[in-house]
Amino acid sequence: MTESSDEEISSLYIHLYFDEDVSAGIVESLRTRGFDVLSARDADALGKSDDEQMLYAVSQHRAVVTHNRVDFEKQHRKFLERGMKHYGVIVAKRRRDVEVISKLLALLDAVTAEEMQNQLRYI
């Protein structure tokens, strides 16, 4: 059995970037559970375009979590059409925070960071 590096272990878990439309309560709930989360507010990226948000998430090796289905479906397609890699887009239907958290936790439990690459998932 070989030893895994911290980087290999951390790559098993999806690192999340929440755009500004997602509730701060959702971000904090996942953060207190020990997940690696970053919000647009944390990144001083409030008011940035969807292109800028997506590029920032990619630069940080993070999957985007958003309620903005239409625009981030376009971002996903654009990346694929250009042969560019992204770390995933998770579109969360607008619902109570506790429901979004539950859906995110189920996804995080079932999907690795590697499996999430270039994927568009709906919760």
Task: Show where each model-derived region lies.
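Conserved BB-loop
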Residues: 36-48
